[in-house]
């Protein structure tokens, strides 16, 4: 990155894979960026469900799902890094009266823009008790980029970026999330090509 280039921060943005991105893990992916800084980036793929259900995941940690509204929900392939580790992206859950709007869960990252990502088992225990966040997306694994790596991929036209909309994550059918994310840019799939930006 040159001294004249201002650093960009894409936290709480979507990365939308361009058609030319052939990496199996990321092809036609929409990734929600939980964190982006000069040190790198971390995100969760929001449109690639696995075969594992939320009930199945809870059973693996000796819990039962206590929420009928989540029955049948899929766990998502969040990315190729630490695929045995769970991440829960959700609306904020705060403890009323706690200092600095402390999160209700032990290991939670508050994401500027209004969402939280929790990695501790207590959020799963809350789901077992019939409580927990109203809207959530559970993944196994995550996507990450080292220093300057994402910026290089952006310069190579591997991704489109747009400010995230939580409704795309939580309220849009999985098969429509790619097109809805493109729609945030005023685009449709036919309008983008693998060679975008190249003469």
Curated annotation (Swiss-Prot):
One of its GO terms (cellular component) is cytosol. It comes from the Bacteria. SUPFAM superfamilies: VC0467-like. Pfam families: DUF179. NCBIfam families: PRK00228.1-1 (NF001266). Belongs to the UPF0301 (AlgH) family. This is UPF0301 protein Daci_1578. It comes from Delftia acidovorans (strain DSM 14801 / SPH-1). The lineage of its organism: Bacteria, Pseudomonadati, Pseudomonadota, Betaproteobacteria, Burkholderiales.
